[in-house]
Amino acid sequence: MTTKDHSLATASFVTAAEHDGLFELPEADRVTPKPAAPKAPVRQGQNKIIPAFGRDAGFRPVPDAVAASASAAHWPGIVLPQLTLAGHRVYPMVAPNAAVWRKRLAAGQEPELDLSTLAYWESWTEDLGPMPPASALTIVGFLSDARPGHALCAIDYLGGLGAGIVVSKARRYPSRNLIWECGFTGAFLVWAPPDRPATLVVSGRTGPVHTARRTPVTRGYEEKLFAWALHTNARPPHPG
């Protein structure tokens, strides 16, 4: 073996050994990198997974039947105007964290939709430095007053984020099949005809499906609904 070949072989061995952890720097010579501070929140214009809505997006007030259905199901929080989420038109219901909500507005911490930033925030711990902004709300669930089949499809698709209410505005009492299907899928069913008070027919699952796990996408939807709440002038109740 030539001197050059020997040098290359030695270099390869040392590199492999370093990768295998055979050679390590003494404790005194190690340098622990200082963690970077959380990124400042910036309103993102686009996100392929959770697309932002336009700043000039229009909205209509929440229908009385939908608001009454949330009350009949004893859901806490604020019903927001209808919004398209993952291709489904629903009325989101959120429970504001009033203290965080007001703190973020006072600090100018706008809703954040960038998933890489949210992944960074969600994994941050107190020992790394000042905590990034907390979520201003919790997703309670979603209401749909669409035709029963479409309503069930929408709230089932969004089941990883929260519960769901099928709002039946028909004059006739809900059918056996609809009652059975809501009971089977864990959806709430509220009958809200135009000439009678809203009535809870099926009490469904509270919260997301039991297999759901919190991810940066979960936080992304919380941030989007925070943005939608601000856009539609929703406010948390004042203390006292």
Question: Where do the model's predicted regions map?
Answer:
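Generic structural signal of hydrophobic/aromatic residues within well-ordered alpha-helices
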Residues: 66, 70, 121, 221, ...
